């Protein structure tokens, strides 16, 4: 049996680095939540236990999915999952908003489910299934349009019904990348149009951050989404309002310096962040572990993502390319939006730092996505030269 490429080292790196990040994230969640434990002697214990449960389920899911034969799952099951996730996304509206977003389903007082996190991963594996074979031009176009419509429906529900701008952006970027990968005939024209649309979208973002537009926005700063754009343009101008938390984030970065104050010694987590263990966990990490800690985090992410990119470039199978590159984009866009938001480079989006931030849904979804990626890499390891999908 001839192997097209061997990713044994890459697979081990992904597994080892992922588990290290999960453990590190759990420790940092415990540290970040110290500020909320004042006056409640059992709060921190509950947080640690809950995070440990999520981490355990995530790791088990990772290894279980790694052994899945994704290509054998019928397309009809994907449509069932799609509808199920869609209903879950809409059902979130029946529950209370958190920071202006209706993105969670409450399971009593113990935990929540965020369906949008699973929607992101689903659209990756669904795209891999839908575009795995090159059919006739008509079939290819129908599949392309079908995927686009289904992605738009998810995007609209997350953006309008849930009011979750960050998750909508992540989903949109993932689906765009998935649709740009297939080299199948008959869709090149549509892919070119999508590229033009993305260029316009980027120009619109720069336009929204320009001085004339931000001056107009000042009269509507009570809107939380507009307030985030204003805070990104000039956080110090809104230091008592929308820019306060961003400024405190920058102060935490400066306070951490090179080596940090030491684990558990962050000062600003006690009073200056609305979600110190989620959206703003990076300032806590840098304040306690310094710039050295941040670079260590970047290296660990690199050990997870580089093998995915390498496998995507080496594989000759469209489905493998979509899964590996889709997961790569999923992690990368989360990292960019989270770091850029707390670093005052872009508006805050509320997206978590995958494998690090608190939240069972994001941890489980991210570990599942890596499991799907590993399943594809393992499959490519042992596939026959003449074996086709």
Annotated model-derived regions:
Residues 2-8, 12-13, 27-162, 339-354, ...:
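Membrane-helix boundary/helix-loop-helix interface segments in multi-pass membrane proteins
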Residues 21, 88-92, 129, 155, ...:
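Alpha-helical transmembrane segments of multi-pass membrane proteins
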Residues 78-79, 83, 145-157, 165-217:
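Hydrophobic alpha-helical segments of polytopic membrane proteins
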Residues 169, 175-188, 267-293, 352-364:
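Interfacial segments of multi-pass membrane proteins
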């Amino acid at each position: 049996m001839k192997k097209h490429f061997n990713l044994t080292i890459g697979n081990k790196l992904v597994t080892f680095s992922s588990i290290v990040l999960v453990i590190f994230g759990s420790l940092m969640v415990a540290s970040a939540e110290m500020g909320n434990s004042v006056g409640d002697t059992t709060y921190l214990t509950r947080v640690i236990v809950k995070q440990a449960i999520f981490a355990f389920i995530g790791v088990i899911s990772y290894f279980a999915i790694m052994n899945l034969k994704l290509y054998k799952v019928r397309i009809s099951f994907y449509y069932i999952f799609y509808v199920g996730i869609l209903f879950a996304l809409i059902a979130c509206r029946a529950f209370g908003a958190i920071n202006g977003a209706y993105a969670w389903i409450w399971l009593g007082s113990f935990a929540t489910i965020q369906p949008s996190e699973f929607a992101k991963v689903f659209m990756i594996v669904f795209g891999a299934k839908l575009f795995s074979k090159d059919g006739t031009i008509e079939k290819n176009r129908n599949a392309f349009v079908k995927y686009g419509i289904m992605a738009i429906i998810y995007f609209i529900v997350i953006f309008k019904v849930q009011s979750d701008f960050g998750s909508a952006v992540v989903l949109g970027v993932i689906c765009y990348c998935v649709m740009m990968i297939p080299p199948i005939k008959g869709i090149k024209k549509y892919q070119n149009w999508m590229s033009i649309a993305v260029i316009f979208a980027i120009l619109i973002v720069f336009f929204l951050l320009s001085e004339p537009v931000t001056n107009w926005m000042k009269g509507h700063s009570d809107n939380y989404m507009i307030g985030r754009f204003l805070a990104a343009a000039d956080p110090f101008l809104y230091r008592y309002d929308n820019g306060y938390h961003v400024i405190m984030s920058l102060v935490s970065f400066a306070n951490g310096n090179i080596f940090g104050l030491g684990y558990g010694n962050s000062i600003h987590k006690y009073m200056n962040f609305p979600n110190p263990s989620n959206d703003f966990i990076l300032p806590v990490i840098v304040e306690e572990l310094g710039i050295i800690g941040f670079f260590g985090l970047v290296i660990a992410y690199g050990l997870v993502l580089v093998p995915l990119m390498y496998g995507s470039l080496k594989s000759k199978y469209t489905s493998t390319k979509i899964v590996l590159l889709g997961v790569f984009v999923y992690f990368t866009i989360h990292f960019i939006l989270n770091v850029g938001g707390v670093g005052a480079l872009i508006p805050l989006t509320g997206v978590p730092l995958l494998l690090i931030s608190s939240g069972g849904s994001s941890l489980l979804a991210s570990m599942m996505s890596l499991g799907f990626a590993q399943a594809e890499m393992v499959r490519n390891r042992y596939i026959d030269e003449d074996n086709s999908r």
